[in-house]
Amino acid sequence: MPRSSATARKNQSNRNENGASSGKKVAKQKSNGHLNGSLNGGSTPGSVSSSQVDLPSSRSTSDSAIAPAAAASSNLNGISDSSKEDCNGREKLNGYTKGNADMSYVQTNGAGSQNGGDHAGQASHRTDKSATGAKRSTSNASINPLQLASTILKSCPMYDTIAILIFLLQLPPMVLTLVQFLFASLTFMPPSGASAGSLSSNFDIFQGPAGTPSLSTMIAMDGFCLLIWALLMWTWAQNFALDLAHVQVAITLGGGGSGKNGGVNTLCVGIVLILHLIRSKGIQDFVIGHLLSSNIISPDLLAQYSHLLPTEFRRTESQTSPSWIRSLLAVHILAQAGTAMARRSMAKNRSPNPPRPGKRVDTEASAGSQTQIDSAFESGASVSSYLGPDGQLITPTAHKDGRDRLLSAKKRRRQANQVRSRQPFWAALASTKVTVMREYEHSRALSKTARGLPMTENDLQGVSFDDGLVWITDVDASTIKFAAGDFASADDSGLSGACEDGRLGNEEIEPFYVCVNGALWATATISRVPDAQKGSGMVHWRGEVSGLAPNCAYTCSFMRSDTDEEICAISVKTPVTNDTEQFSLVSPPPQPSYRPSSPTTTLKNSIVNAEAKLNEKRSRLRKAKNDHKLIISKIRKELDNYNHRLHSGTDENRQKQRSLQLERNIRQTEEATALLEGQLDSLENIPEEELREWSDQKAKYDQELQLLNSAKEELVSARSAVAREVSSLESDLGSTVQRRERLQSRRTRVNEQYERIVSANAQGLNERERRAAEQFAREQDQAKLEANFNEQFGSIGQSVQEYQLRAQQIWQQCDAIEQAIQQQQQRMLLDSAPLTPEGNLPGTNPFSETSALPLGALTSTAPNSRSLLGLSFPAIKSSPLQTISSALDASSSHPTSPVQPPSFLNFPASPLVNATSHLDSDFTYRDRSFSNRSARSSLYGSEFLDSSRRQPFQIDLPELLGEKRNSGSDSTALKSGLRPVSSPFQRAGSRGSGSGSNGSGGSGSGSGSPSSAYGKPN
């Protein structure tokens, strides 16, 4: 609950919003309490910029000491005291006034007015008013202790925790799962004060940003506990862990973990353990089994006292495993509880030494607020003191002590979050309500000031100034400029007229005065705008508050001069000075303050600030004087040096000095030359030992060089050999790859063929059966045809036999005719005469004279030639049924030599041929007659007879006989060893073709070339 400002300023309130004890109480402390706390006891300090003005903590409506004073004061605007108290009880932001919150604005960019008027009597007048303010503050200090105690809620963490645990154990499973889910989701929310950049950093393994574990730590702990949960825990242990999660939720919501001892934790865990011992069969079996195995109790004793347990507590069935949703939530809650315990233990190890005895330290106050050092002003400041960030005086001893105790911003934020996490549930709700209300008031104030934009005096047109209005026009590092409207009313018409006529003194024409941090500010100047008229102008008064310290928070209170009533209070923070040289000797403080100081502290800060400025200017002046003195002395020295050189130096002296310098240089050069010549002489004579050593080293070098060259040659040869091997292997590899590719292509083709064959076979199963049926039908037809052909062959064989008999008779007749012709030819040859009177022609050789051969040889037929008349017949194969062969057949079965004519050609000369003819000589000796056939016209050519002789004309009898044969076979040929004579008149189809039949009851056919039948007996 918020306290009154007067009470806070006097008593240094010792309670915060959570009911915990505050920091140490400083005796006779006159500064404002909660210097670094937020408004209304909030935990987060509000940062106020230089362009934004905030009001201090307002007085509560329960402040009984303020009500009489407010009732006694006069009301210029006709507003009741209760409404003023209500307005004063609310928190005023952005310069809202006490009387009318809608008429209060803050202007930071307005132009400040010139300070006009005479201010000679202001100091004495405000000194008289200070006594009245002191009396009012004394009267406000009287507050009822019972009323103050009734506003504080007592903290009972043990009772709250046990009550919440009992409530959670009675909830149904669905609602309990929802509660656990909401509680688990709170662990993933970033704490207050955590930035986006700090969420990605890890302070250490258990301590994350802003006092919370990092996301990676939470995930790792959840995974580790989930692994233990799934692998190493029984069913009864999982159910027990679920209830332990309820204990963690109850301890967190009830604030049971904020105590120094673990009594609440032990009590809650004991309650859950006793319940499970009574109701869980698994735990009973587990505990009893261990007790019996360790011989702590005997089975008889256990059976004796087991009947005392009520029947409803005896569970016969085992508990089922919890659902995976509740298991995940319980694992997460227990894992974060273990992480919190580890972080607390580490925080204890990291915490500084405990404070000295007799001092009480508030954890939250030390984490969220700055150490108060205002007591340094009360005890007196030394000469070596300097200003703090808010204008406070800090001695070296106090600064060293405070610097040791101050924490970094991150560590303080972490500690504040740790303290906030230990707050009970009702305290968190109260803090949330206060924060929401504060933000609501702040947003409403911003909306009324045009979304926080800086306002000018032109923006205040149409605003009522009946109750008076004060606003800030400019805020500087050491000054605050403000403007005010008209404060005169109907009741003060006489006073207003006197002010306008100038009949009153300078002290009485100022309707208000300024107090800074509760102290009457003597350096505040207020001047009236001369051109402003009543009701027609907006700005009637302008003023300036000077003598302030930069980067400090101030509360400027505007008080009425006649009634000492507070018109409004505005909180302003001066910006940092732009002068970089100012306060260069003062080291920067550890942490700036955003709350105003006490009146005494403010006055002392102002005095010290002015003295510091004066000292700074004096030090600058002294430093400038010293610098100027040093520069002047340096310039004078240089001037004296130049004058001395100018007056003392002549041409002769300069030439002498130059000659001496040259002589000195020449002497040094000669000495260096002599030294170098001595070194050269010593280097020309080489010692024998060094020469021998050099030769040995050179020989070793040459030997090593030869070894190196040989090694290089071996390396080159080895590289070439390896290169050849590599090239051969590469060629083998290439050939192998090509062969492999060919085999692969062949394999691909074979696979394709195989697939086609398989598909064809699969498709041709029915075709095969059809073909088998057709083949069977064809075989039957062929069997019928074969039987028919056999019958025909039998009839043909009989006809062939008949033809053979007839052919034999014809051959006999032919033999007789041929014999007669041969005889006639012989007689013609014997009786032949020369064809010319001169005798034989050259080149002719009569047969009677030149040839020693018998006459029968002339008519003989060589195997490859023809007879004279062409009546030689080829051999005719006889039928195998023929049993009687003639003498001609016998002689023809054994062919003779080509030179010797066969015996059947030696026929006796016919008597008809004895007569000579006039054609004999011409027939005999004419080489180119028709009868003189060329050997080249025959098939085989004449090899033994004289080719120049004219051969007798022969008749191709086999051709004549072949025309009569229907079958075209040569079965009727004569059985002779003569080769068939081919004639140009013979058909091509009759050459080398023949057929025969077997007379043994069978029939057959054959074919062959003429040469194949030669020399083969039948």
From Swiss-Prot:
**Which parts of the chain span the membrane according to its record?**
162-182, 217-237, 258-278
The ranges of region (Disordered) come to 1-138, 342-371, 581-602, 962-1018
Ordered alphabetically, the record's keywords are: Coiled coil, Membrane, Transmembrane, Transmembrane helix, Ubl conjugation pathway
Subcellular location, record wording:
Membrane
Q: Where does this protein have compositionally biased stretches of type Polar residues?
A: 1-21
Biased composition annotated in UniProt, kind: Basic and acidic residues: 82-93
- Kindly list any coiled-coil regions of this protein: 601-788
Q: Topologically, how does it sit relative to the membrane?
A: Multi-pass membrane protein
Q: What cellular component GO annotations does this protein have?
A: membrane
Q: Where is the composition biased (Gly residues)?
A: 991-1007
**Location (main, coarse):** membrane
**Which segments show compositional bias classed as Low complexity?**
45-74
Assigned protein family: Belongs to the acrB family.
The free-text function statement in the UniProt record for this protein reads: Component of the regulatory network controlling carbon source utilization through ubiquitination and deubiquitination involving creA, creB, creC, creD and acrB. Involved in resistance to acriflavine, and required for normal growth on a range of sole carbon sources, including fructose, cellobiose, raffinose, and starch, and reduced utilization of amino acids, including GABA and beta-alanine, as sole carbon and nitrogen sources.
Under which name does UniProt file this protein? Probable ubiquitination network signaling protein acrB
Species: Aspergillus clavatus (strain ATCC 1007 / CBS 513.65 / DSM 816 / NCTC 3887 / NRRL 1 / QM 1276 / 107)
What gene, per UniProt, encodes this protein? acrB
